[in-house]
Amino acid sequence: NNTCMLLCTSFIMLTRISMDKAVRQFIIMVVAAVITMIIPYVIDRTWQLAKIPWVYGLIGLALLLVVCVIGNTSFGAQLSISIGGFSFQPSEFVKISFVFFVATMFYRSTEFKNVAITTGVAAAHVLILVLSKDLGSALIFFLAYVLMLFIATSNWLYLAGGLGSGCAAAMLAYKLFSHVRVRVEAWQDPWSDIAGKGYQVTQALFAIGTGGWFGMGLYQGMPKKIPVVEKDFIFAAISEELGGIYALCILLICLGCFMQFMLIATRMQALFYKLIAFGLGIEYVVQVFLTIGGVTKFIPSTGVTLPLVSYGGSSILSTFILFGVIQGLYVLKRNEEEEEEQ
């Protein structure tokens, strides 16, 4: 039900913004739905998933390196690659393989040597994303790894060290990358350059304020004034035309999905499956936070999409796969409980 509500909202807004994009999104959604129906059966019947950590790790690094070297540049960041006229964003799919890699490594061992090796590979993922200037994805990967490490080891020193290194890396990124400074400055005082670097943020705030609690109604607002509104700023369009109450409902639905992920994670007995559910849940909620936080000026804009709502084939396909994996873990746990009862 939650997924259907988010998808319906997406199609309503995309139809409003661009019918062509809405049709493309629908076609990709159908393909994603078919793939998602297969995933739970694969997870329930395939025990080899926990035996190939380096397949997950090396494939993920290879895809990110390809984007870093020959990827298409969008708003200062290298995000996608084009093959046969189609463009896709590998980092959306590497988020899933990354969680599988970390879960598999920590399932094997949580001794310091293995933690150090896993941390090195995880850091390589994050570093490549930083070099590609895809800082939103880098932050998602980083937080997912630190929290998965803590769940696997229950070591508070790892958690403190990870968060501390993250803060230091954020300050370093601010000094090294000009587009990071632009985003931070636009967040701090967008009104000082309302026609330049603060334009996107201020237009989003205008849209949210204009919509009020109940919205202006479909086709009554001006969401197209916001650059790339169909992607990382679609929450502003929802607030403007459907209202703040509706937008809050979308936020609560996203939080409800996250809580379901966490409930499934706590019920899984095997550490491998527990870490997968937890890691995917963290990635999902961090992405929601970055998107909505950036639109509402709570944090600097990071350029990530709102899962299942924003336009983007890679985004919707990877999110469907993520939900399919979680559903597979739920089916696995249910089957285990039925076997115990018998």
Can you name each region flagged by the protein language model?
Residues 85-92, 131-133, 212, 216, ...:
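Glycine/serine-rich anion-binding loops at beta->alpha junctions
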Residues 134-139, 214-218, 229-231, 248, ...:
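Transmembrane helix boundary and interhelical junction motifs in multipass membrane proteins
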Residues 190-231, 235, 244-246:
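TM-adjacent membrane-interface loops and short helices in multi-pass inner/ER membrane proteins
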Residues 290-342:
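A juxtamembrane structural motif centered on a specific transmembrane helix
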